[in-house]
Amino acid sequence: MKVITCEIAWHNKEPVYSLDFQHGTAGRIHRLASAGVDTNVRIWKVEKGPDGKAIVEFLSNLARHTKAVNVVRFSPTGEILASGGDDAVILLWKVNDNKEPEQIAFQDEDEAQLNKENWTVVKTLRGHLEDVYDICWATDGNLMASASVDNTAIIWDVSKGQKISIFNEHKSYVQGVTWDPLGQYVATLSCDRVLRVYSIQKKRVAFNVSKMLSGIGAEGEARSYRMFHDDSMKSFFRRLSFTPDGSLLLTPAGCVESGENVMNTTYVFSRKNLKRPIAHLPCPGKATLAVRCCPVYFELRPVVETGVELMSLPYRLVFAVASEDSVLLYDTQQSFPFGYVSNIHYHTLSDISWSSDGAFLAISSTDGYCSFVTFEKDELGIPLKEKPVLNMRTPDTAKKTKSQTHRGSSPGPRPVEGTPASRTQDPSSPGTTPPQARQAPAPTVIRDPPSITPAVKSPLPGPSEEKTLQPSSQNTKAHPSRRVTLNTLQAWSKTTPRRINLTPLKTDTPPSSVPTSVISTPSTEEIQSETPGDAQGSPPELKRPRLDENKGGTESLDP
């Protein structure tokens, strides 16, 4: 695993808000789209150099938006690129095979001459009233969902360019949206602190998730806390994601309150019960803002001894969680991260994306730069020869049947073998196998290990009160020079930096030396129509000064 922050002025040194790798090209080319405050969408070619690091080449500048662009997403086939921005429109781009470039009023002639590819807008989707924050495609590429500052999410028929459904249950900005690969749900996450899961077939809310029980009060009343951060989060994105097989829903921007302590986390939901999480993945320091899954299915790691699994799948899936200042790498065979990347950017991260073969993980930041994590062949695992066949449902072909979602509470928690007794799990949920026989990755130099939140030794106890998280101030000038910290399992508990070679985790490694996730078992209250009860319910401020307040051309990059 290697990391490089490319010295490229991706968007004229303006903040980069989103990026996305093109899939469906059978590995012929790693094409990457990026978007930022400069109102442009840009296409890049990413290759792996002889030293294993990423090499980036400019391909095209797509100029049609009139305000900042917040999100770019390729369709599953890779033919169409969707972009959404502060101008409240969604543009659908496609490569123009004509040799003569299209005349665009928004693009300078000098910039157009640099283009190696010609992209043209094939459709413009108008329906949102305010900034578009997130976009996701259906698996077949015929439908699309978008999330906006106007408190709504819209389902689009891409071929007709028309709205199918408008979901307006949220009370504040909708900052993330994801499409179920099996075609049954669309999930949204808002700064009103509510996760809403919609039934695509019924076109209405199936689940509302907002609060979790924290214990019983002195007088016997049930106490609860809010599961998600309020609008004090420094990020304007909460990019949640289903796993490629649809078995899990991964939601960032989570927070766990235990007494006076507040822990940032990412919640893991099983599609068998989307009312409450089966686990949460603590993140040290800062709130999480994006989750993206590697599209490759991997073979299970061999194990030395059999234990109770947390996520029982016949294959292994890998996903990345981005916080405000770091990226953690997880897989479905264990509940703690196997990789950690930090200290690569001066400002808040904004988006992450995997290449189709899992060789690259791209990271964008509001400091105007992007980084790449590269993986050698089979470093993440041995890919399956054939992907599993998904049993998809579409609005046109799905039968109107009763919901198959479990409506009762799951059996009580029980200890997981080979882990601290206080770590419990829902037996109906997917499982994980302890990675005693994990293959050793390539040797890596470990420097300045960060302080990691210790594992919680008991289920979340006692009554808790709602807390408002205050964003920490940033001082760019006082930040030290960039450096990359790659942490894997054996470096988490070290207190002083030292050079070591990575070796597989031994069977006798004490549990206290490994950061573990907390398996959440209390029930979640289902809220049918709720107005957030926190005192500070005002919308967040604008992301940044508008473009007309920060005019400036392309600047040469300092070495």
From Swiss-Prot:
Subcellular location: Nucleus; Cytoplasm
Biased composition annotated in UniProt, kind: Polar residues: 469-495
UniProt keyword Chaperone present: yes
Modification after translation (UniProt): Differentially phosphorylated during cell cycle. During mitosis the p60 subunit of inactive CAF-1 is hyperphosphorylated and displaced into the cytosol. Progressivly dephosphorylated from G1 to S and G2 phase. Phosphorylated p60 is recruited to chromatin undergoing DNA repair after UV irradiation in G1, S or G2 phases.
Superkingdom of origin: Eukaryota
Gene Ontology biological process: DNA repair; DNA replication; DNA replication-dependent chromatin assembly; nucleosome assembly
Residue positions, PTM Phosphothreonine: T394, T419, T433, T495, T509, T521, T531
Record family assignment: Belongs to the WD repeat HIR1 family.
Biological role: Acts as a component of the histone chaperone complex chromatin assembly factor 1 (CAF-1), which assembles histone octamers onto DNA during replication and repair. CAF-1 performs the first step of the nucleosome assembly process, bringing newly synthesized histones H3 and H4 to replicating DNA; histones H2A/H2B can bind to this chromatin precursor subsequent to DNA replication to complete the histone octamer.
Protein name: Chromatin assembly factor 1 subunit B
Natural source organism: Homo sapiens
